[in-house]
């Protein structure tokens, strides 16, 4: 039986020392779709996506209860290879974070880390990734130049290219447009629409309009809980919970 869900979260609770951050989270993420996570600051959205590639593991006091399944396998099983997990579940952060290397080496870096050393393969994969990130035409003549010289929007697309170079199954995006201007934001949103054909994308956003533009599914977080989740259109047009309605109409948050 083929599962239609890329990620399934069951009864997830997350603690940092005595602080109970996420409470009884249940959520299914379908394959090759965009799911938006919305909610006020401090409600647990970023903590949640960091449970999906075990980035919280490095934070002192972290512990969890419950299950997070990727393609049917619990990522918190003791035999899980965390390096391999993070290859499958890539991450794009709020602020673009290119390495102080050339544009080419920024994209090639992950390939080298994962053991690829064939020059022709790396060159081909770098070009494919930059094209997929809608950046190739802007940088193809300056691949040896520092990535730090790119604009903010270009740097964020470079970070997306770096993420997809190692062919993940899932891309996590933690407010990827919050530091960008409107034109750069539009380019990232257009890119998300294109990437969903090949990847499962989960995006944290405070921008309600962005959530409606880019996602098929939405989950509303509040005080560490999911108030409701479902089709984005339903969440925004006919929310089932008054707290959801109050948030998306700007009554709080």
Swiss-Prot record:
Membrane topology, record value: Peripheral membrane protein
InterPro entries in the record: AAA+_ATPase, ABC_transporter-like_ATP-bd, ABC_transporter-like_CS, P-loop_NTPase, PstB-like
Span of domain ABC transporter: 7-248
Pfam families reported in the protein's UniProt record: ABC_tran
GO biological process, one term: phosphate ion transmembrane transport
SUPFAM superfamilies xrefs: P-loop containing nucleoside triphosphate hydrolases
GO annotation, cellular component aspect: plasma membrane
Keywords: ATP-binding, Cell membrane, Membrane, Nucleotide-binding, Phosphate transport, Translocase, Transport
Function text: Part of the ABC transporter complex PstSACB involved in phosphate import. Responsible for energy coupling to the transport system.
Family: Belongs to the ABC transporter superfamily. Phosphate importer (TC 3.A.1.7) family.
PANTHER family for this protein: ABC TRANSPORTER I FAMILY MEMBER 17 (PTHR43423:SF1)
Protein name according to UniProt: Phosphate import ATP-binding protein PstB
Species of the source: Methanothermobacter thermautotrophicus (strain ATCC 29096 / DSM 1053 / JCM 10044 / NBRC 100330 / Delta H)
